[in-house]
């Protein structure tokens, strides 16, 4: 039972890590997108 438990824990942590990595990636893309938008606004403002 203990081996199975630790295996499930590993699976759980792995999915959690993958999930947060995915979130971080999405956040980074979001930030990149806004930087581009900001650049556009700045070029138009000049």
From Swiss-Prot:
Gene Ontology CC terms, in alphabetical order? cell cortex; cytoskeleton
Q: Name one GO molecular function term.
A: actin binding
Task: State its location(s).
Answer: Cytoplasm, Cytoskeleton; Cytoplasm, Cell cortex
The alphabetical list of record keywords is:
Actin capping, Actin-binding, Calcium, Calmodulin-binding, Cytoplasm, Cytoskeleton, Repeat
Q: Does the keyword Cytoplasm apply?
A: yes
**Coiled-coil positions:** none
Got any disulfides in this one, which pairs? none
Question: What's a BP term from Gene Ontology annotated to this protein?
Answer: actin filament capping
Homology family: Belongs to the spectrin family.
Subunit (UniProt) = Associates with the gamma-tubulin complex in brain, but not in kidney, liver, sperm, or uterus. Like erythrocyte spectrin, the spectrin-like proteins are capable of forming dimers which can further associate to tetramers. Interacts with isoform 1 of ACP1. Interacts with CALM and EMD. Interacts (via C-terminal spectrin repeats) with TRPC4. Identified in a complex with ACTN4, CASK, IQGAP1, MAGI2, NPHS1 and SPTBN1. Interacts with CLN3; this interaction regulates the fodrin localization at the plasma membrane.
- What does the UniProt function comment say about this protein? Fodrin, which seems to be involved in secretion, interacts with calmodulin in a calcium-dependent manner and is thus candidate for the calcium-dependent movement of the cytoskeleton at the membrane.
Give the protein name, as stated in the record: Spectrin alpha chain, non-erythrocytic 1
């Amino acid at each position: 039972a203990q081996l199975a438990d630790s295996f499930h824990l590993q699976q759980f942590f792995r999915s959690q890590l993958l999930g947060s990595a995915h979130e971080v990636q999405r956040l980074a893309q979001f930030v990149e997108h806004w930087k581009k938008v900001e650049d556009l606004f700045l070029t138009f403002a000049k």
